[in-house]
Amino acid sequence: MNSARAGHLRSTPPPSPLSSDQDEVEIDVLAEEEDGDQTEEEDDEEESHKCLERSLQRPGARTLAGRSAGDCGDLSNSSGFLRKFRAPRTPATTTADGPQPAKPPYSYIALITMAILQSPHKRLTLSGICAFISGRFPYYRRKFPAWQNSIRHNLSLNDCFVKIPREPGHPGKGNYWSLDPASQDMFDNGSFLRRRKRFKRHHPPSGGHPHCPFPPPAVPATLHVSQPSLLLRYSAPPQPNLAAHPAAPPRSHPCAPLHPHPMRYLLLAAPAYGDNPRKAEGADPATPLAIPALQPVLGSQPWERDQSSGTRSGRGCASFTIESIMQGVTGGGTGSAQSPSFAPWSYCHLLQHPPCLLHPQAASPLFHMSAGSRTILPQQPQPPLPLQQEQHHCAISCAPGKGVRLGQHLSAVAALLRQQPAADDGRLTTLAALSGREGTLPEF
C-alpha cells in the first residue's frame, strides 16, 4: 500500500505554493456548486413539465387558463381606462366647487315690481313672476322652490299689489297681479334698491253715509205717554205768514206714523205758559213728564203772546195745559179773524187702530175729567162757531158710524169749557199747578 501511494504522488504534478494551492481548491469547489445548481434546475423543470401535463389532462383547464390570462389583461386595461376617466373629471369638480353667484340686493317687493313692469300688459301671474326672477338672477335659479312661497306671501300681504281675476275667455290657472296706480312713487327715483315707505291703500269707511249739508226739517218732538206705541207725526199745512212764527230747532227728530195713511194733524208750536215761566222751562217736551197734546187754534193772541216764552224754552214744541185751552177759548172771539186758516185737528192718531175701528167706549176716557176740575169750572158763554165745525168734522172723520155719540162727548167737553170765567186768573193758576204736579193726564 505504501508503494501505491508513492506512485500516485509521483504521477501528480509538483505542489505549488500555498496561495496557489488554496485558489485551486476554491475554484474546484465553485465548479462543483455550479454543477449542483444546474442539476437542481433541471429537476425543477422536469417537475413543472409534469405538472403541466397533469393539468392539461383535467377537463376545462384550458378555459380556466384563458380566463386567468384574460383577467390579467382586463386589469391592466381597466387601470388605464380609470386613468383616462379621472383626468377629464377633475376640471368639472373644480367648477362645481367654485364661487357661487351672490344674492341680488333687491327685496321681494322690488323683484315682483320688476317682473310686473317688464310685462307688456303690466300684469303677471305667480308663475310668470317666478319665471322672470329665476331667468334674470342665477342665485334664485339654483334655489327655486324655496323662495316661491315668499313671493306668494308678499303678493297677498302688501297693498301695492292688486289681484285681478282671470277673464272667463282666458283659460289658465291663477289670478293676475298688477301694481296699484297710487304706488308708482314707491321707490326713490325709480331705483329698486331703496323704498320710500310702506304703501297703504285708503279704504272708504264701511257703512258711512254722505254728510248732509242741510239740517233736517223742523218737526216738533214726539209725545211721551204711558204707552210707547202712541206716537205722533206732525204734518204742517202751508202757512201764509211764516215770518210771524219762530222756526223749530234742527235738534228735533221725526217719528214713525201709526198707520200707512195718517191724517194731517196740527200741533200748536208755541205753548202758552201764562204767568209761570219757571214751570214752562221745566216742562220740556223731551222729558217723560211733559205731555204735548193737540189744541185747536182759535186765535192768534196766544201765539203772539207766548212767542218769547217759546223761544226761551229751546224747543218750541206744544205742551198740553188746561190754561192754554182756556186762553184759546177766551181769545177766540176777537182773534179768529186775524189768525191764519189751519187744517182741522183730531185725536185719532192717539189710537192703536185705524179710525174706522173707533168705538165710543175707547174715545170717552180721552175727554173724561176729574171731579175736582169740574167744581172749579163755572158757567161761560158758548164757544164760537169754528170750534163747533171742527168738532163736527172730527166726529165724522174719526168714526163715520158713531158720529152721534162722539158728538155728544164733544158737546160735553164744550160745556165744561164754557164754565171757565174770563177774569178768574187765580183758578187758572191753581189748575195749571195741579196739572204740572201730576205730569200726565188723569186718564193717561
Curated annotation (Swiss-Prot):
<keyword id="KW-0804">Transcription</keyword>
<dbReference type="InterPro" id="IPR036390">
    <property type="entry name" value="WH_DNA-bd_sf"/>
</dbReference>
<feature type="compositionally biased region" description="Acidic residues">
    <location>
        <begin position="21"/>
        <end position="46"/>
    </location>
</feature>
<dbReference type="InterPro" id="IPR030456">
    <property type="entry name" value="TF_fork_head_CS_2"/>
</dbReference>
<dbReference type="InterPro" id="IPR001766">
    <property type="entry name" value="Fork_head_dom"/>
</dbReference>
<feature type="DNA-binding region" description="Fork-head">
    <location>
        <begin position="102"/>
        <end position="193"/>
    </location>
</feature>
<dbReference type="GO" id="GO:0005634">
    <property type="term" value="C:nucleus"/>
</dbReference>
<keyword id="KW-0539">Nucleus</keyword>
<dbReference type="InterPro" id="IPR050211">
    <property type="entry name" value="FOX_domain-containing"/>
</dbReference>
<feature type="region of interest" description="Disordered">
    <location>
        <begin position="1"/>
        <end position="70"/>
    </location>
</feature>
<protein>
    <recommendedName>
        <fullName>Forkhead box protein D4</fullName>
    </recommendedName>
</protein>
<dbReference type="Pfam" id="PF00250">
    <property type="entry name" value="Forkhead"/>
</dbReference>
<dbReference type="InterPro" id="IPR018122">
    <property type="entry name" value="TF_fork_head_CS_1"/>
</dbReference>
<keyword id="KW-0805">Transcription regulation</keyword>
<dbReference type="GO" id="GO:0043565">
    <property type="term" value="F:sequence-specific DNA binding"/>
</dbReference>
<feature type="compositionally biased region" description="Pro residues">
    <location>
        <begin position="247"/>
        <end position="256"/>
    </location>
</feature>
<feature type="compositionally biased region" description="Basic and acidic residues">
    <location>
        <begin position="47"/>
        <end position="56"/>
    </location>
</feature>
<dbReference type="InterPro" id="IPR036388">
    <property type="entry name" value="WH-like_DNA-bd_sf"/>
</dbReference>
<keyword id="KW-0238">DNA-binding</keyword>
<feature type="region of interest" description="Disordered">
    <location>
        <begin position="234"/>
        <end position="256"/>
    </location>
</feature>
<dbReference type="GO" id="GO:0003700">
    <property type="term" value="F:DNA-binding transcription factor activity"/>
</dbReference>
